[in-house]
């Protein structure tokens, strides 16, 4: 936790690095209850109209508040705000060397210790939830559910040191480090939720995973397997169709296009299947319109989205928080970029948590899904 809030949006994957550092906000906008959301979004829009830059996070549960039919599903005992956005004068661009220097200045070499690591569910509890998902799929309620649980742990030391250590092990294009007086958010997300440049919108959902091989030959085989596996392709295509529909709610008619399907991206520990979608935004679309149409990302709910979110609330029980929400920025011009907040740690005075999970479809296997999770 920190007295002076900051947001580091960290692309450590692009050669040379490409990060944005936001410090000393003029104002912090947050919402903890559904009744506060509308005013908070208006305050963000007003700040942008004044030439300020917005950066921070939207929690997964914000999506429940944006849809009247789902608001009653909001879980009690939430640890983080529904949204936390700082309004800043302008970000400081950093290359990789500059980012590492800033991290070092703020405690990257200090102590960071995790202990008492444990899952929120037992294997038996996961199996019960998995079977319930399969029943819903068999009944025709949904085609896919993204079922998640959490690691909880004790933490001692400097959150910046933990982020720096994780960053060294996993280079990603959509990382983030957020410091507030009440919590820290550390995200090593490889997944782009959406990017807006002028009226151009792009999204890159990620669905489908394979481990890296122990040898170059095994690694190539696993990458080829992921690219060709029918189950992985089917899961990916479901989410592509969902996001095409979501983008269509804010896009010019006929402008939504799939740029590529089933592209495999390679990271240090896994191969990931991604696809690309682009669209041209209608001129009358503002922040609220975009969030109501797109949030949360379909890759972390399942399809169809609204019914999937109802089932997630029933089976998971606990709030996801920042995990599977979105972290990013909005410029005064309206340009914006947000990640899907996967591979994300939240630290507060009570310790830390990290959500994990995966998509379940009709032919999923409980043993395999538990092992992957």
How would you label these PLM feature ranges?
Residues 1-372:
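Extended alpha-helical targeting/anchoring segments
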């Amino acid at each position: 936790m920190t007295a002076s809030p900051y947001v580091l949006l960290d692309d450590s994957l692009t050669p040379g690095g490409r990060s944005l550092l936001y410090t000393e906000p003029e104002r912090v906008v947050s919402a903890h209850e559904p009744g506060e959301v509308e005013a908070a979004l208006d305050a963000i829009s007003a700040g942008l109209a004044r030439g300020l830059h917005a950066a921070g996070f939207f929690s997964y549960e914000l999506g429940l508040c944006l849809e009247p039919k789902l608001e009653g599903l909001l879980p009690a005992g939430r640890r983080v705000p529904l949204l936390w956005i700082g309004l800043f004068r302008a970000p400081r661009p950093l290359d990789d060397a500059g980012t590492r220097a800033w991290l070092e200045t703020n405690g990257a070499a200090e102590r960071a210790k995790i202990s008492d690591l444990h899952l929120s569910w037992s294997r038996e509890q996961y199996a019960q939830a998995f079977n319930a998902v399969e029943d819903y799929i068999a009944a025709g309620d949904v085609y896919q559910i993204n079922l998640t649980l959490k690691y909880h742990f004790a933490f001692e030391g400097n959150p910046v040191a933990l982020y720096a250590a994780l960053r060294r092990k996993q280079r990603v294009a959509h990382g983030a480090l957020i410091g507030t007086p009440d919590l820290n958010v550390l995200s090593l997300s490889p997944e782009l939720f959406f990017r807006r440049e002028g009226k151009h919108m792009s999204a890159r959902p990620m669905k489908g995973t394979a481990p890296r091989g122990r040898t170059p030959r095994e690694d190539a085989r696993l990458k080829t397997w992921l690219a060709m596996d029918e189950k992985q392709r089917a899961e990916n295509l479901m989410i592509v169709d969902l996001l095409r529909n979501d983008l269509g709610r804010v896009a010019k008619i006929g402008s939504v296009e799939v740029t590529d399907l089933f592209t495999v991206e390679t990271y240090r520990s896994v191969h990931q299947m991604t696809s690309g979608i682009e669209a041209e935004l209608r001129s009358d679309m503002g922040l609220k319109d975009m969030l109501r149409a797109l949030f949360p990302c379909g890759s972390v709910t399942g399809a169809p989205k609204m019914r999937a979110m109802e089932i997630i609330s029933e089976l998971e029980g606990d709030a996801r928080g920042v995990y599977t929400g979105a972290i990013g920025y909005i410029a005064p011009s309206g340009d914006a970029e947000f990640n899907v907040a996967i591979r994300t740690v939240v630290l507060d005075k009570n310790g830390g948590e990290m959500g994990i999970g995966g998509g379940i479809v009709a032919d999923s296997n409980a043993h395999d899904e538990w092992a992957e999770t």
